[in-house]
């Protein structure tokens, strides 16, 4: 795709005659937000390719239907923050923007240092920050922007772990890749047995591959629309200049399939995979949407987001009464570790049942967006008969 596939109210059907999009019998239909790369120059241990000017920067590369990662430091384990520091005056009321590192862990002479990202693990969320400057004398790193809040759970604290991502000097392991943003040269270190002839390499371009956009506040809904047997793949996400940090569940991130005002509709036998963000978002006004027998795998963040983070005064904007049944969620949080398999925000009466959920770093199913006694729409949700295992894995400290 050169742009997301878009549907609006005029594209829906009726209860008697729903609009159906199905894979042809025996067909393999992939809606891809990426571009297959070819024309590699092959050397002894690496392939190189000059990317065109219109190819956006990307954070994951997909090789033979598997995510491949940029070089990071340390190559195993994590670095430890030597000392958490108060924010600088510019961000005193906004969030953390610096910490003291152990001497030698960070270097000012890294190639394209502005492209290096610090992945800071908090209690239940993760901040991905860019480097503004390094004070070698004091061993202090300053970010280009603050974390999401000054609360303890959003600050880079003493003893917290962090990774350094996208370091060209660490490129030494088969399966890794590095894109030089200045020269636009992509370098890939192939795994044993991989050749340009037997290897499909896809660079993601689009953040979304399918957008379904109604306007529930104006009673303009998309209804009776169904998708069967389709694959949604190869979405992109790039760290913004100020970094990325959010409260919980990677809730601010986009999804490969995003819907507003979608009702009485179905996703059946679909695959959501090889993504840098979430799989699906059922936002404001999405009601009675059934997601059944679908596979969500190799996810950059989470699987499905349902609802909104506020309580809309206009009840037409409420999302709920949806079903997630007999689906498989696996290998999530591969780039944004705090993404859960299923997140129900301010949304009532949803049913999540008979799903297999495994290999996520955050919760399998998260419900709600209220930390206290304020009004919540997250009532009447039923979570039943799901098989859940290999969750948390001690990556985030609350799991």
Predicted regions and their residues:
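Extracellular polysaccharide-degrading/modifying enzymes targeting complex plant/algal/animal polysaccharides
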Residues: 1-261, 266-271, 312-316
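Structural detector of coil-to-beta-strand junctions
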Residues: 4, 207-209, 256, 278-279, ...
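A generic beta-sheet turn/junction motif
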Residues: 124, 284-286
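Functionally critical, cavity-lining and gating residues within the transmembrane helices
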Residues: 124, 335-336, 394
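The substrate-binding groove and active-site-proximal loops of carbohydrate-active enzymes
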Residues: 253-258, 276-283, 305, 309-316, ...
